[in-house]
Amino acid sequence: MAHKKGVGSSRNGRDSQPKMLGVKRADGQFVLAGSILVRQRGTRIHPGRNVGRGGDDTLFAKVDGVVSFERSGRDKKTVSVIPVEAAL
């Protein structure tokens, strides 16, 4: 017979690093060209006017301006940047 108790090991104890996803700039906020607006997986929010989409679906401002979130249809969200000249 064993004189020591067999010690099992838990099969838990792992987790992935946080990915810091989500909306980074609010509606009505002024942004500079190149600013990241949304970090996401897939196109949950679609790029609108003056907004580009990166290879990892990150949305970024192409011009200086004011952020505008819109809803088109029942379930499609878009984010646009209204240029500074037009916003004044």
Curated annotation (Swiss-Prot):
A GO cellular component term found in this entry reads: cytosolic large ribosomal subunit
Q: Which domain of life is it from?
A: Bacteria
The keyword Ribonucleoprotein is assigned to this record: yes
Q: Name one Pfam family in it.
A: Ribosomal_L27
Keywords associated with the record: Ribonucleoprotein, Ribosomal protein
Q: What InterPro entries does this protein's entry cite? A: Ribosomal_bL27, Ribosomal_bL27_CS
Q: What is this protein called?
A: Large ribosomal subunit protein bL27
**Native source organism of the sequence:** Pelotomaculum thermopropionicum (strain DSM 13744 / JCM 10971 / SI)
